[in-house]
Regions:
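Short, charged/polar N-terminal "headpieces" of proteins
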Residues: 1-28
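Polyanion-binding surfaces on beta-sheet-dominated domains and ring/shell assemblies
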Residues: 14-15, 76, 95, 103-104
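Active-site- and interface-proximal helix/loop "cap" or "latch" segments in soluble metabolic
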Residues: 21-91, 95-97
C-alpha cells in the first residue's frame, strides 16, 4: 500500500490518498479522505477501483479524475489533489518512482 498526504494550500483541506494495487490487470483500489466536499463527491461518484493505466498513462489534465473535476469542481485550476492521487497511484503500481513533489513560493 502507498499513502500520501496532499497539502493543497490556503483552503486547508489536507487530503490523504491510499492506493493498493490489485494482483490482476493493473487495477488499483483508492481511498481518499479530504475535508473538501468536491473531492468527497468525486470519490463517491467514481468509486474506488480504477485501471492504473487510465489514471496514470494519460495526457496532463485527462483521465477519470480530471474529467470529473472539469464537469463538477468549483473553479480552482491549481488544486493539487488530483495530481497527488495520481502520484500515489503511479508509485503503488510501479509506474513511477516514489519522490516527494512540491510547489514553493520564493522571494
Amino acid at each position: 500500500m502507498t499513502k500520501v498526504r496532499i497539502e493543497p494550500g490556503i483552503c486547508g483541506f489536507t487530503a490523504i490518498a491510499e492506493a493498493e494495487a490489485a494482483e490482476e490487470d493493473f487495477m488499483v483500489h483508492l481511498r481518499v479522505a479530504s475535508g473538501c466536499a468536491a473531492v468527497q463527491e468525486m470519490m463517491k461518484a467514481l468509486g474506488s477501483t480504477f485501471s492504473a493505466f487510465a489514471v496514470c498513462l494519460t495526457r496532463p489534465g485527462t483521465g477519470p479524475f480530471y474529467a470529473y473535476a472539469a464537469e463538477h469542481f468549483p473553479v480552482h485550476a491549481a488544486c493539487p489533489v488530483i495530481a497527488g492521487i495520481t502520484k500515489c497511484t503511479e508509485a503503488e503500481c510501479d509506474l513511477a518512482l516514489r519522490q516527494d513533489a512540491g510547489i514553493f513560493f520564493e522571494e
